[in-house]
Amino acid sequence: MSLRIVFLGSPTFAVLPLERLVADSRYQVVGVVTQPDRPAGRGKMPVATPVKQAALRLGLPVLTPETLRDPAAVADLADLRPDVGVVAAYGEILRRDVLAIPPLGYVNIHPSLLPLYRGPSPVAGAILNGDAETGVTIMVIEAKMDAGPILAQRVVPLPPDARTGSLTRELFAIGADMLLETLDAYATGAITPHPQDHARATFTKLLSREDGIIDWSQPALRIERMTRAYDPWPGATTTWRGAPLKIIAARVRSDRHSDAPPGTLLDTAEGLAVATGDGLLVLETVQPAGKRPLPAADWRRGVRLTGGERLGG
């Protein structure tokens, strides 16, 4: 008899785990819970989440409550009679009344090696800190965020050029593979959840636009990591002549220094660079406001820089 699953997820990278569950005869996805349609694009027309679009394509029942704090939404979820819930970036912390619905609780795909990087921005956190490795954790959800016992983990090398968007997709693809075997083993009692070492826990926060604003007095290494950690959101941003400028890609020259104030644009043999608090940051790709990304050299030729101009000033 197939295990009855309710799937909770919203963004693009949560679609693959859903598709893999539907394709596996051991599991029966009895319903999908995702965020409501939100206005998007220039016309601000309501747009369904990628998970909702996938669920409709797969012929699955879909619930889109504004919040699972709504008693009616909780009742609708209970009516699905799931044995277990699977969560992949749903977008809301589950309360105890929701957690109590499936007899086996909820299993979550978390893109870090818990207890490290609990919270909403684990991939960005690992990149920003320059970690050599990251990973995926399959865990049982408890009321406290990302603190539940662990079912499985896999270590994944963190390349020095990793960006949050692409790495998140990779980690959730790995998580989808892990989920299929872990879920069956958990349901049959073949594996036992083991508690996290809470003393080792580290935490991340929901990123805001302000997090992406570059402080040029920081080291070049830190700023370069920002360009990758904050891709696609919120981006590593500064201003030039009063207008926003996003730094898409750059490289660090920690062996090169300048007496110019942080943020000063410098022509170097390696290209357009910026003075920082420690080392030079050579710009590779930038995006002016309202325009597409372009090579920094092309931007440099088009804007007619004058000597001593500064970013962020």
From Swiss-Prot:
Could you tell me which Pfam families the record lists for this protein? Formyl_trans_C, Formyl_trans_N
**Superkingdom of the source?**
Bacteria
Give an example GO cellular component term for this record: cytosol
**Alphabetically ordered keywords of this record:** Protein biosynthesis, Transferase
Which GO MF term does the entry hold, naming one? methionyl-tRNA formyltransferase activity
Please write the reaction equations for the catalytic activity of this protein: L-methionyl-tRNA(fMet) + (6R)-10-formyltetrahydrofolate = N-formyl-L-methionyl-tRNA(fMet) + (6S)-5,6,7,8-tetrahydrofolate + H(+)
Q: Which InterPro entries did the record assign?
A: Fmt, Formyl_trans_C, Formyl_transf_N, Formyl_transf_N_sf, Formyl_transferase-like_C_sf, Met-tRNA-FMT_C, Met-tRNA-FMT_N
| Enzyme Commission code | 2.1.2.9
Kindly list the positions annotated as binding (6S)-5,6,7,8-tetrahydrofolate: S112, L113, L114, P115
Outline what the protein does. Answer: Attaches a formyl group to the free amino group of methionyl-tRNA(fMet). The formyl group appears to play a dual role in the initiator identity of N-formylmethionyl-tRNA by promoting its recognition by IF2 and preventing the misappropriation of this tRNA by the elongation apparatus.
Provide the family line: Belongs to the Fmt family.
The protein, known as: Methionyl-tRNA formyltransferase
| Gene source species | Roseiflexus castenholzii (strain DSM 13941 / HLO8)
Origin organism lineage = Bacteria, Bacillati, Chloroflexota, Chloroflexia, Chloroflexales
